[in-house]
Amino acid sequence: GIADAGWTAIGLAIGTYLNWKIVAKRIRLYTHVAGNSITLPSFFSNRFRDDRRILQSIGAIFIVIFFIPYTASGFAACGKLFSSLFGVKYLTAMIISALIIVGYTTLGGFLAASTTDFIQSIIMSIALIIVFGFGVSVAGGPDAVISHAKSLPGYLTMMTTYNPETGTEAAYPLINIVSMLAWGLGYFGMPHILLRFMAIEDEKKLSLSRRVATTWVVISLAVAVMIGVIGLGMTEAGELEMLHGANSETIIVKIADLLSTHGVLPALLGGTILAGILAST
């Protein structure tokens, strides 16, 4: 059902808004007061007048420790994507991807990272639109997609879920709701997000930025949830095989593969989708 993805999307949207509302302006103003700090560790040291730079060292250690698995997961995703696309060894694809990412980040610094974020957001938006439109078309139209989803008990509700093994609906546990909503708390401690708050040129632009960011998150996550429902409709139409468990997360890749079999232009569009997946890692 949509409960897992739906509650996660709600949590991420709320977390995005509250992070911009509560943290953004404060950290931007205090960054200016604290010697125009350009990193979180230096901000903590300057903010609390830590002349011995103990806070800076501790902050840097924590970021390194917790960002190793975070960045490693991104490198692993790149390796899996290129390995499946081009048939190269996974380790080779991962190393090449890591070298490219680390290279442009090192050479271009924060400006390069911010610029690529902007470009990647555009690519991801285009990819979502293509997947959404193509999926609905192949599944037989919006009515067919919704009709099939409604035929599964509990599939389209947020308080129940569909059990494919028994074909019945089951109550969605409260602990699961809380766990999914808690995803939004992660935004408050992400250094790469807080750095963008610190770097904004004028705090007066934060209100507009908050509206744009929240709107983008709500729309993109809503479309992402709907793509899962569309994938179910495509399965019912016989265009895709049923995906179970963790494999259900590959639905966008499956749709891109299907799209690429319809000619040269669709193949290029499929490449755009895969680029969007890569951009999101």
Question: Where do the PLM segments sit?
Answer:
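Loop-to-helix junctions at membrane interfaces in multi-pass transport proteins
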Residues: 1-11, 45, 122-270
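Helix-loop-helix module between adjacent transmembrane segments
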Residues: 7-105, 182-186, 195, 274-281
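Helix-loop junctions at the membrane-solvent interface of multi-pass transporters
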Residues: 22, 86, 107, 133-137, ...
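N-terminal amphipathic, basic-rich helices that act as targeting or association modules
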Residues: 105-106, 210
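Residue-level micro-sites within transmembrane alpha helices that shape
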Residues: 116-119, 191, 281
